[in-house]
């Protein structure tokens, strides 16, 4: 049997692509080395931020606005436990922060609902937060956070119900191209399709070693926090930049536990075995202390944590491009620790590719050729 589309890697982007391509009427095979959602990639840990006024660059704003529309649509499948929670996101940092300047510029260019607060305004609205006098806050009222594992589970179930074939716990070991399309090799045999999407996350280089993607071990952890830090008390999700440039992110507390992580740093790794569990690297448990001590001093001790992996590109911008020499294979990789919020729209882009539709977005900034 020859499929219209084979998806290699069915985590965040792959799960979305499987659903949108199947819904469009294509004959699709989703594959994954594990059983998604799982703990081996970049999507576990329950929650991920979604920010609209994008500090990483204005080029992402059209993508994230479309992503938000798709998240809202997906959330309607889980109204009792919504996938998107509009908690708002407060971006904290020094007034001269380049990241915050980008946030402000994105908001201005796209007329986004962002409120600027000085240090006193921040602390008056959220007494739990402490910042120096030279800090500002840019509050995105329409942003919030996503339930990442629930989203993937929902997409996979919807795709299955729509007739998508799914081959999980079965790694793809090789990809071959010929005039008839794409063939993948697995322990279960070979499968063929007209087109393929490669969104295999951190270990994409096991299949395509020439790609400029660097795996980095990262951690996040949950700390004691009472109801003052909850959504019910209107405590927001947040990003925060310390004076030394370190970047942190976090979420409102749930069940008396507040999740926080450090975006920069981490440990470069070269195999899955090197991604050791949380607390096996000495700095894991204390990584968030500089932020907690200075910005959220009322937060208690570390309860537990987890390790995940970033698939970093050299400039930490996405790679969305066809495989060189093979226009029937689309790469979506190098998401560099800020990709989950875009999973919905990237899945839609993948489905459009499989249908020979031109993308509605300017994907030029994400081409591989920028590294040549």
Swiss-Prot record:
Enzyme class: oxidoreductase
Catalytic activity, reaction form: N(alpha)-methyl-L-tryptophan + O2 + H2O = L-tryptophan + formaldehyde + H2O2
Binding site for FAD: 4-34
Stated name of the protein: N-methyl-L-tryptophan oxidase
A single cellular component GO annotation: cytosol
Disulfide bonds: none
Residues bearing the modification S-8alpha-FAD cysteine: 308
Gene3D superfamilies (UniProt xref): D-Amino Acid Oxidase, subunit A, domain 2 (3.30.9.10), FAD/NAD(P)-binding domain (3.50.50.60)
An annotated Gene Ontology molecular function: N-methyl-L-amino-acid oxidase activity
Family: Belongs to the MSOX/MTOX family. MTOX subfamily.
Binding note for cofactor: Binds 1 FAD per subunit.
EC code: 1.5.3.-
Lineage top rank: taxon: Bacteria
Keyword Flavoprotein: yes
């Amino acid at each position: 049997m020859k499929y219209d589309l084979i998806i290699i890697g069915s985590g965040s982007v792959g799960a979305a692509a499987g659903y949108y391509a199947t819904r469009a009427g294509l004959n699709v095979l989703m594959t994954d080395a594990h059983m998604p959602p799982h703990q081996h990639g970049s999507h576990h840990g329950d929650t991920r931020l979604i920010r609209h006024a994008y500090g990483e660059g204005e080029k992402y704003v059209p993508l994230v606005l479309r992503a938000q529309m798709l998240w809202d649509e997906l959330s309607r499948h889980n109204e009792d436990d919504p996938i998107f929670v509009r908690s708002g996101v407060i971006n904290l940092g020094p007034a001269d922060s380049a990241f915050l300047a980008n946030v402000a510029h994105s908001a201005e260019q796209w007329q986004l609902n962002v409120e600027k607060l000085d240090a006193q305004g921040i602390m008056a609205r959220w007494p739990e937060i402490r910042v120096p006098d030279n800090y500002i806050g840019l509050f995105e009222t329409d942003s919030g956070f996503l339930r990442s594992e629930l989203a993937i589970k929902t997409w996979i179930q919807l795709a299955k119900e729509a007739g998508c074939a799914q081959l999980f716990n079965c790694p793809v070991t090789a990809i071959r191209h010929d005039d008839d399309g794409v063939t993948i090799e697995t322990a279960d045999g070979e499968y063929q399709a007209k087109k393929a999407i490669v969104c295999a996350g951190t270990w994409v280089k096991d299949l395509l070693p020439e790609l400029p993607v660097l795996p980095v071990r990262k951690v996040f952890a949950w700390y004691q926090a009472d109801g003052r830090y909850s959504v019910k008390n209107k405590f927001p999700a947040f990003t925060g930049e310390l004076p030394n440039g370190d970047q942190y992110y976090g979420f409102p507390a749930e069940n008396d536990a507040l999740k926080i992580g450090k975006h920069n740093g981490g440990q470069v790794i070269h195999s899955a075995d090197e991604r050791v569990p949380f607390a096996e690297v000495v700095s894991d448990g204390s990584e968030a202390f500089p932020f907690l001590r200075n910005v959220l001093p009322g937060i208690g001790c570390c309860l537990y944590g987890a390790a995940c992996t970033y698939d970093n590109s050299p400039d930490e911008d996405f790679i969305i491009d066809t495989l060189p020499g093979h226009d029937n294979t689309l790469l979506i990789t190098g998401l560099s620790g800020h990709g989950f919020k875009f999973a919905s729209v990237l899945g839609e882009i993948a489905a459009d590719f499989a249908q020979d539709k031109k993308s509605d977005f300017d994907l030029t900034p994400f081409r591989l050729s920028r590294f040549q």
